[in-house]
Amino acid sequence: MNELFPYQKIGAEWLADAKDRWLLLADEPGLGKTAQALEAINKLRIREALVVCPAIARLNWFGEVEKFTKVPLRLHAYSFNTTFMERETATAKKSHTVRPKKELLRPWPLLIVDESHYLANPSSQRSRAVYLHIAPYAERVWCLSGTPA
């Protein structure tokens, strides 16, 4: 089990203690936003969480879970790309629509949107998939970004 730096403990406490449902943790790159989120999960004793992130970050999440979680945690990590979205044929005017996979359309104790700046365009299909179809049913939504817009 790795130990957090003092500044990371402050961020983790802020995530865990905040009363707001939506939070943005916007530390600079490399300061350990993943570790802070996992420490907050420990404090809140969350047993299951959904992470939506770039494909390259998925393996990092699984590695960090091993290092930082103290409670049993089922972490579901999906990339912004096709691993969490399905393409469905629509009308002749529009060749396809993008929706989250059906298994993601359920209540979640926690949704973490890692590198949330990738969802800055509210009209993009992946932003709409996350913010309209998944986030409304999550008890908590934590957006993590080292590049806030």
Predicted regions and their residues:
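SF2 helicase/translocase NTPase motor core
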Residues: 1-138
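Short aromatic/hydrophobic "clamp" motif used to bind/position activated sugar donors
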Residues: 141
